[in-house]
């Protein structure tokens, strides 16, 4: 029998869960949540904050449920269809014109001053920002003036947030508008060019999203999308719940002793940097497109002797043999099964006996609604993004293991670990050369 959910019952849950979260934050000497500009831009991460993460998730789940129940069936639908497209449009204007930079962190600025700097009429600035304010992005401290809130100030506190949002609104949003058309014409294809973004931007047969972002633009501007994507990934790597911190506890890095880790498709090296800080015996080689080599300049001076960069096409055999660990963090979810198997095959020529391959990625549930809906939504958002952008599927644990088996019989899955407070899992694979 389905349990009856009531407003009163949910309200009691929200009150109890809010009290629990507040108590845990106070015990950890952490500030209470706030809409003010000085609010922490992200919740605390790490194993020591697992109870806080669990309490936060429970509260979000109940708060979302009471909102949806109060809305009712039709308003639940129209809240999406009527509002979200304009929410995205307002946010797109805000990031494209870099409006957060025009507002002092602890002051105010007039709509007229913003209009003068962005170059379009004040009445349009007013309409766009007033709509954003209904999502707590900026506030109006007095008529005619704009001030920061926590969400709008997050762009100042974490500049790469703008890159991540711009990528989603410039590219993913456009691709989403082509999803229905794509499903009608090539819904069963595993080819990257047959994705929704391939249709939105006119990819040639055989071309991938990665080809597109590496080559778009002319002269010095060539590859600007690739550079923006790399910066955006820094934002997601530092944010919850797919933070790189889950890697610290999901695998025994210290137990490797002095070892070499290949960060396959490691972008700007943000994950290698954090792991290098935590594990001083490890050396890292970041592999990615040649165009990202300049990001090595951003490696802290004290780590440059332990972090290097190599150009590597993951669709070709890996050129760095005999390392101890090959890390694929948020890589294979970008590819259909056909290509995920190929990428794992391409590691084999480089692997020594006993080498580890770590797949750090999202594992979809075997069944829908197998956990908190808020956490499941994070998984399905990722799944939709991968389908739209790269024609890749969501994979359950069984699906992931099947991909590994298809790649090479000498691969053996040793462990699958999902740290508390994260939507990411780590699949540890051992290569047995004599198997």
Curated annotation (Swiss-Prot):
KW Transferase (keyword) present: yes
Sequence positions that bind S-adenosyl-L-methionine: 288
Gene Ontology molecular function: any one: O-methyltransferase activity
Active-site residues per Swiss-Prot or TrEMBL entry: 333 (proton acceptor)
Entry keyword set: Methyltransferase, S-adenosyl-L-methionine, Transferase
Entry superkingdom: Eukaryota
Top-level EC class as recorded in UniProt: transferase
Family: Belongs to the class I-like SAM-binding methyltransferase superfamily. Cation-independent O-methyltransferase family.
Name used for this protein in its record: O-methyltransferase tazO
Species per Swiss-Prot/TrEMBL record: Aspergillus terreus (strain NIH 2624 / FGSC A1156)
């Amino acid at each position: 029998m389905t349990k009856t959910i009531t407003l009163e019952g949910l309200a009691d849950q929200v009150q109890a869960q809010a009290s629990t979260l507040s108590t845990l934050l106070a015990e950890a000497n952490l500030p209470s949540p706030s809409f003010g500009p000085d609010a922490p831009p992200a919740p605390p991460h790490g194993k020591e904050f697992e109870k806080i993460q669990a309490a936060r998730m429970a509260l979000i789940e109940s708060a979302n449920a009471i909102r949806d129940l109060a809305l009712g069936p039709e308003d639940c639908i129209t809240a999406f269809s009527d509002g979200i497209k304009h929410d995205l449009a307002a946010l797109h204007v805000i990031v494209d014109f870099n409006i957060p930079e025009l507002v002092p962190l602890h002051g105010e600025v007039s709509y007229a001053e913003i209009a003068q700097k962005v170059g379009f009429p004040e009445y349009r600035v007013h309409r766009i920002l007033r709509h954003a304010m209904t999502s707590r992005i900026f506030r109006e401290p007095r008529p005619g003036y704009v001030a920061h809130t926590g969400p709008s100030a997050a762009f100042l506190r974490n500049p790469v947030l703008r890159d991540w949002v711009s990528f989603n609104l410039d590219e993913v949003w456009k691709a989403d508008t082509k999803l229905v058309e794509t499903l009608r014409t090539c819904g069963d294809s595993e080819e990257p060019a047959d994705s929704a973004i391939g249709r939105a931007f006119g990819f040639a047969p055989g071309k991938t999203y990665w080809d597109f972002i590496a080559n778009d633009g002319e002269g010095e501007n060539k590859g600007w999308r690739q550079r923006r994507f790399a910066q955006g990934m820094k934002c997601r790597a530092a944010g919850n719940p797919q933070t790189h911190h889950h890697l610290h506890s999901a695998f025994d890095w210290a137990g490797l002793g002095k070892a070499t880790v290949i960060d396959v498709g490691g972008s700007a090296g943000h994950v290698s940097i954090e792991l290098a800080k935590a594990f001083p015996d490890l050396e890292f080689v970041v592999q990615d497109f040649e165009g990202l080599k300049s990001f090595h300049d951003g490696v802290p001076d004290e780590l440059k002797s332990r972090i290097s960069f190599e150009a590597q096409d993951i669709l070709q055999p890996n050129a760095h043999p005999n390392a101890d660990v090959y890390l694929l963090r948020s890589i294979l979810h970008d590819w259909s099964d056909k290509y995920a198997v190929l990428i794992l095959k391409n590691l084999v020529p480089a692997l020594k006996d006993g080498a580890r391959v770590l797949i750090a990625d999202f594992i979809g549930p075997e069944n829908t609604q197998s956990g908190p809906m808020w956490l499941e939504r994070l998984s399905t958002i990722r799944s939709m993004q991968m389908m739209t952008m790269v024609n890749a599927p969501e994979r359950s644990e069984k699906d992931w293991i099947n991909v590994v088996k298809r790649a090479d019989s000498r691969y053996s899955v040793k462990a699958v670990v999902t740290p508390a407070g994260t939507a990411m899992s780590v699949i540890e694979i051992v290569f047995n050369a004599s198997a």
